[in-house]
Curated annotation (Swiss-Prot):
Component of the SSP (stage selector protein) complex, which appears to be a heteromer of TFCP2 and 2 copies of NFE4. Interacts with HDAC1 and PCAF. Isoform 2 interacts with TFCP2. This is Transcription factor NF-E4. The keyword Magnesium does not apply. It is found in: Nucleus. It comes from Homo sapiens. Acetylation at Lys-43 prolongs the protein half-life by preventing ubiquitin-mediated degradation and reduces the interaction between NF-E4 and HDAC1, potentially maximizing the activating ability of the factor at the gamma-promoter. Ubiquitinated; leading to its degradation by the proteasome. Acetylation at Lys-43 prevents ubiquitination. Residues 143-153, 163-179 have a biased composition (Polar residues). It comes from the Eukaryota. Functions as part of the SSP (stage selector protein) complex, a complex that contributes to the preferential expression of the gamma-gene in fetal erythroid cells by facilitating the interaction of the gamma-globin genes with enhancer elements contained in the locus control region (LCR). The complex binds to the stage selector element (SSE) in the proximal gamma-globin promoter. In contrast, isoform 2 acts as a repressor of gamma-globin gene expression by preventing NFE2 and RNA polymerase II recruitment to the promoter. The keyword DNA repair does not apply. The modification N6-acetyllysine is found at residue 43. Specifically expressed in fetal liver, cord blood and bone marrow. Also expressed in the K562 and HEL cell lines, which constitutively express the fetal globin genes.
């Protein structure tokens, strides 16, 4: 069953050096083909310790779902350490969450949305939806639809397959001299 594991939790429980696999680094090993090494975790964290740290850090960092605690394969020649890969995943997820929080935060000057039934205020005396954008010359197409949807004019006759079969004289005919 998958568990949610955060990089901060792994760092706190296992330490930086214990995030790598049990595979040993062998100096001077040069081979063009990958070497099969047994993978085993260095240290398993207790579930209670994980829950405690996750409850404290859940709001502070983006987490990723993994099936087990950090089983890492052997790194290639010149590759970074496995805990740096996990750190890159963590740092990749955090800006997206920060951007989403800033976009909906109270200090965003571009878009202000008040929920339905909100108490009237100085900015919104009626207490209804208020959406203001940076381009007032070009209103939002979904919020300002003044024209009804375009309808097909009844003056244009629509021909079905049966109507085309009844009027074959209107279809151009090909002669052998044309082809």
């Amino acid at each position: 069953m998958p568990r949610v594991v955060c990089w901060h939790t792994l760092k706190s429980l296992n330490g930086y050096k214990n995030l790598s696999s049990g595979a040993e680094t062998r100096e001077g090993l040069r081979s063009s083909s990958p070497v099969d090494l047994p993978l085993r975790p260095r240290k398993q964290a207790t579930a209670a310790g994980q829950r405690k740290l996750l409850s404290l850090q859940l709001l502070l960092c983006a987490c990723t779902s993994v099936t087990d605690l950090t089983y890492w394969g052997p790194a290639g020649h010149g590759a970074t350490a496995p805990h740096r890969s996990l750190l890159a995943i963590h740092l990749h997820l955090v800006p997206a969450s920060s951007a989403a929080m800033k976009a909906t935060g109270p200090h965003n000057a571009q878009t202000q949305v008040n929920p339905q039934g909100h108490a009237p205020s100085a900015e919104d005396p009626t207490g209804t939806w208020t959406v203001s954008g940076p381009c007032k010359d070009h209103p939002h197409p979904f919020l300002s639809q003044s024209n009804p949807p375009t309808r097909i004019s009844s003056a244009l006759p629509l021909k079905t397959d049966s109507a085309l079969e009844q009027t074959p004289q209107q279809l151009p005919s090909l002669h052998l001299s044309q082809g």
